Amino acid sequence: MNKVVLLCRPGFEKECAAEITDKAGQREIFGFARVKENAGYVIYECYQPDDGDKLIRELPFSSLIFARQWFVVGELLQHLPPEDRITPIVGMLQGVVEKGGELRVEVADTNESKELLKFCRKFTVPLRAALRDAGVLANYETPKRPVVHVFFIAPGCCYTGYSYSSNNSPFYMGIPRLKFPADAPSRSTLKLEEAFHVFIPADEWDERLANGMWAVDLGACPGGWTYQLVKRNMWVYSVDNGPMAQSLMDTGQVTWLREDGFKFRPTCSNISWMVCDMVEKPAKVAALMAQWLVNGWCRETIFNLKLPMKKRYEEVSHNLAYIQAQLDEHGINAQIQARQLYHDREEVTVHVRRIWAAVGGRRDER
C-alpha cells in the first residue's frame, strides 16, 4: 500500500499537496501528489511499495498544517455491485489490517458528497459487522488498535486502508463536531473551541485551561474568543478599540481595554494565555506573537494567521520559521503547532507553548 489519502478543506488541495511533498521528502519518502481542485482531498503516491505505511507512522500528524486526516490505502475499488458492496471491501482489507479498533466510512467535505455521506452512515453498521466476522475489526472498539478507513469518492467507488490511532485525527473526517453556543457574541468562538480540542490533549484541560487563570484577548471585539475563556472561568483582559458584548461584561470576569492590540503591553506577569484573531498581514502578527513569547508575557498562545491568495504554504512556513528562530535566539524551548481548522477559512490557527527558558525571566510551566 503506497498511497496516502489526506483530507483537507476544499480549495486548499495545492497547499496540502505542497506540504506533504515537502515533509515526506525531508524524511526521504519520495513520491508525487495527485490533486483535483476543490475535491477536498489529496492522494500522495509513494514510489516505494511500503512507504505509505512508513509515512503515516514516522511523520507526526500534528506537524501537518493543511491535512485534517490521513490514512494509507491500496488501489481504488470501482464499480462496487449495489447488491453486495461489502464483500469486495472486506476482501481488500483482509490481510492488511487485523483486529482494528474502529471503523470510519467517510467522504470528502464537499457539497457534492453530502448525499454520499448519508449512505456512508447507513452502510457503516453492516460493514462493521462483516469486518468483525472477518477478523479485520476487533469485536469491540479500542483506541489502542489501528483505525480502518473506507473512503468513498463517488457512489460505488472507494479506497480502503487504515491509520494509526496514535498518529491521526481522533475525529470522524478530521472534523470536531461542535455546536454554536446561542449566547456567544460571534461564530468565531468556534475557532478557539476547536483549537483547544485539536492542540490540547483532553486529559490536560483541567491543568492548562484552569479556573482562575488570567488571559489576554488581542483584537477581542465583539468577544467570540473572550467567550471561550470566560466559559472556562478565566479572568480576561479584552483589548480592542471596538466594544465588547454586554453579556460578557456582565460576568464581571472581563476587563475591556480600549487599545490597539499591536500596541498593548501587559503590566502583570501572571498571564497564562494570550489569544489573537486580528485581520492583519501574517508577518506582522507573527512578529507580535514572537515578541510576547520572547518577553515571557504569556505561557501559551493561540492565534490566527490570515493567508495570502498565493503561496500560502510558503507564507505560513516562513512565519512559523521566524517565530522558531526568535525563540531559539533567546534560548526558549517551545512547542509550535499549526492547523487549518474546520472553522477557519482563509487562515490557519497556530498554538505555541513555552516549555522553559535558558535565560532569566518569567517562571515557565516546566
Curated annotation (Swiss-Prot):
Gene Ontology molecular function, alphabetical: S-adenosylmethionine-dependent methyltransferase activity
Sequence positions that bind S-adenosyl-L-methionine: S188, C221, P222, G223, G224, D240, D260, D277
KW Transcription regulation (keyword) present: no
GO terms, biological process: methylation; rRNA processing
Entry's Gene Ontology cellular component terms: cytoplasm
Keyword match Ligase: no
Subcellular location: Cytoplasm
UniProt entry keywords in alphabetical sequence: Cytoplasm, Methyltransferase, rRNA processing, S-adenosyl-L-methionine, Transferase
InterPro entries according to UniProt: RlmM_FDX, RlmM_THUMP-like, RNA_MeTrfase_FtsJ_dom, rRNA_MeTrfase_M, SAM-dependent_MTases_sf
Catalytic reaction(s) noted: cytidine(2498) in 23S rRNA + S-adenosyl-L-methionine = 2'-O-methylcytidine(2498) in 23S rRNA + S-adenosyl-L-homocysteine + H(+)
Record: active site: K306
EC code(s) of this entry: 2.1.1.186
Coiled-coil parts of chain: none
UniProt main location, coarse: cytoplasm
Protein task: Catalyzes the 2'-O-methylation at nucleotide C2498 in 23S rRNA.
Listed HAMAP family: 23SrRNA_methyltr_M
Family: Belongs to the class I-like SAM-binding methyltransferase superfamily. RNA methyltransferase RlmE family. RlmM subfamily.
Complex and partners: Monomer.
Identification of the protein by name: Ribosomal RNA large subunit methyltransferase M
Organism for this UniProt entry: Escherichia coli O1:K1 / APEC
Lineage, broadest ranks: Bacteria, Pseudomonadati, Pseudomonadota, Gammaproteobacteria, Enterobacterales
